[in-house]
Amino acid sequence: MHSVSSISEESLLPFLRVEGKNDLSGQIKISGAKNSALVLMAGALLTEENVHLNNVPNLTDIDVMTDLLLHIGANVNRNTNQVLLQANQSDLSKNELPYELVHALRASFVCIGPLLARLGEVKTPLPGGCRIGCRPIDEHIQGLKALGASVRIDNDTVIAKIVNSRKRLIGTKIKFNCKSVGATETVLMAATLAEGETILENAAQEPEIQDLANMLNKMGANVQGAGTSQIKIEGVSHLKGCVHDVIPDRIEAGTFLIASAITRCPLTISPVIPEHIGAVIKKLKQCGCSIEKAGKGLKIFPGEKISSVDMSTSPFPGFPTDLQAPFMALMSIATGTSKIEETVFERRMQHVGELQRMGAQISLSENTAFISGVNELIATSITGGDLRSSAAMVLASLSAKGTSVIQGLNHLDRGYENFEHKLSQVGAIISRSPNKLKIDTKSSEDLQKFSSGTEVA
């Protein structure tokens, strides 16, 4: 076990200092869903009129999407949690997405759908790799081809073009080989301006897709069945502007529910749509927590002890892969043994080593972790290797004995708005420092590796 003081090498990365074993109480406000807001911003490319989005989280991923839309000629104005977008045909001067932005934000690849439908041709680099496994774009490409587009890959650039004389995509029936959220969103947006009816089978069912469909329908699209495995889209010739509120972030809500459980302190989380986190609520209740509705949110009362439960990730409505790492942190101090299986991504277990540094008893077999709960974790110097494992490190530190130092904040800032401030407001002793931090040399290689990675979850 390495203590915070066993250090010998300097890092310029900012860090969090978290003092464990402090009681939390009060209410945490949940921000708008990052994974929804990003796609809604891309969806605004489907019309020349103004699209006004409310409840947009202030995150670095939103910054990147803003830069990308500005690069291709769209007008984007941001004010706190509001975004006003307009994509005039005459202003969309570029149909090629810049490598550095697509590489930084994989979610930007969904722009290929609306840009193809609007401009008839689009070029985009292959999306940047992330540190949690392979995310093939085959489903995106096959879906666009099925709509009549010519799609090829040349020197790591995807080139998509409408080649028919009518210069419109043509509706058809498309069956995805796997439930891909990104591919469902890409093809759904493209199909709204296609000629005729498009039917998407084996479509992803995530709430963010429902949110996208709701906005598109406000814009004049005809989308039915979003949230089920079959989505029907009747194409229209043009779409109009709209005002739309981004749904609450279900992953952030789940993260703070787990924060309550791991500290054994009751919290109120609001706003929350309970149906969006049903699998998480079910598992927390099995752990011994009591959860009840409280206005537009939920109140959680952790039990005197946390019971171990097995969990397997799966696409919605199953347990979300984005909460696998925080839930493993919780199971690390649960009574008994548990098994956590990651079925969505093949390399999403980087947090195991960091939890072990804190004293967690975890053995790993490929994508399955076996956890024997310990009485308490011990504070140390740790690193979040991706967005959700960074959050897991904070939760583990809240329950640990002593003061932990956490690096990897570049990941954390991609998906959690004012994360440490929200925790401070309910009693956590947590502070961010931009200063130099001396780090344990044994973890310096991991810090270098993780700090250069990209992450979208």
Curated annotation (Swiss-Prot):
GO terms for molecular function: UDP-N-acetylglucosamine 1-carboxyvinyltransferase activity. The keyword Hydrolase does not apply. Phosphoenolpyruvate binds at residues 34-35. SUPFAM superfamilies: EPT/RTPC-like. CDD domains: UdpNAET. GO terms for biological process: cell division; cell wall organization; peptidoglycan biosynthetic process; regulation of cell shape; UDP-N-acetylgalactosamine biosynthetic process. The active site is at 130 (proton donor). It is an enzyme of class 2 (transferase). GO terms for cellular component: cytoplasm. Coiled coil: none annotated. It is found in: Cytoplasm. The modification 2-(S-cysteinyl)pyruvic acid O-phosphothioketal is found at residue 130. Disulfide bonds: none annotated. It comes from the Bacteria. Its EC number is 2.5.1.7. Belongs to the EPSP synthase family. MurA subfamily. Cell wall formation. Adds enolpyruvyl to UDP-N-acetylglucosamine. This is UDP-N-acetylglucosamine 1-carboxyvinyltransferase 1.
